[in-house]
């Protein structure tokens, strides 16, 4: 199991704002914690980009079994609260969607519908066209002082909850019945190229030597 985390908005788009924060900054902070706690089981998509505006998913090249989660925060009146998961409305929620929805609505209660199917959003459609499993998670309302306080104080709980929804453990813990050797996990990122051809050349060289390589 491997997670591919997209932090919503960015690249000059702050997203929703409220209580002294921007959506883009907060979900990037959460993405960072998911990456830190998830170790080699997590890839954080380039946070300098706006993956909606630049149509990033359509040019994405990752293994088809990677699970994509796009992180957002809701915006409405100051009294609106709650977290939920959005999926492509043409499909049924899977076990991961339901586990995420149960987790996030437990931390951010208030929504009557915790899994919502939408057919009008670009990224769910782009992911489906590429054959990638995808869901968008709204982590409470940035316009709610209560939700923002919970988000900030329980960020690691949210990050761990996301990992656990996919059967993954945070680094340094294990829910598996198998005995594994404890130790640090080191990740290596090789190269950044302006030319896609050069990136593809290096990826091919790494794959020929038996290494897993992806271009993001």
Features from the language model and the residues they span:
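Solvent-exposed beta-strand motifs enriched in subsets of small alpha/beta binding domains
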Residues: 6-8, 173-216
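Long, well-ordered alpha-helical scaffolding segments within enzyme catalytic domains
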Residues: 25-37, 92-110, 147-174
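Hydrophobic anchor at the start of a short beta-strand
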Residues: 40-43, 66-68, 111-113, 134, ...
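Active-site-adjacent mobile loop/cap segments within catalytic or ligand-binding domains
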Residues: 4-6, 59-63, 68-73, 77-80, ...
């Amino acid at each position: 199991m491997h997670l591919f985390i997209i932090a919503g908005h960015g690249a000059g788009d702050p997203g929703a704002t409220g209580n002294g924060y921007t959506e883009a900054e907060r979900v990037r902070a959460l993405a960072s914690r998911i990456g830190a706690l998830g170790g080699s089981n997590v890839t954080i998509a380039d946070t300098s980009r706006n993956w909606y505006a630049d149509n990033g998913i359509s040019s994405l090249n990752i293994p088809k079994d990677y699970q994509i989660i796009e992180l957002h925060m809701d915006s409405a009146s100051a009294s609106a609260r709650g977290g939920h998961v959005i999926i492509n409305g043409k499909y049924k929620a899977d076990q991961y969607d339901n586990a995420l929805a149960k987790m996030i609505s437990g931390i951010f209660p208030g929504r009557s519908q915790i899994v919502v199917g939408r057919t009008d959003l670009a990224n769910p459609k782009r992911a489906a066209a590429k054959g990638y499993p995808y869901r968008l998670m709204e982590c409470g309302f940035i316009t709610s002082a209560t939700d923002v306080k919970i988000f900030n104080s329980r960020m690691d709980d949210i990050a761990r909850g996301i990992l656990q929804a996919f059967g993954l453990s945070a680094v340094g813990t294990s829910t598996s019945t198998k005995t594994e050797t404890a130790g640090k996990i080191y990740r290596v990122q090789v190269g950044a190229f302006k030319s896609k051809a050069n990136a593809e050349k290096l990826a091919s060289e790494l794959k020929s030597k038996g290494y897993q390589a992806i271009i993001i």
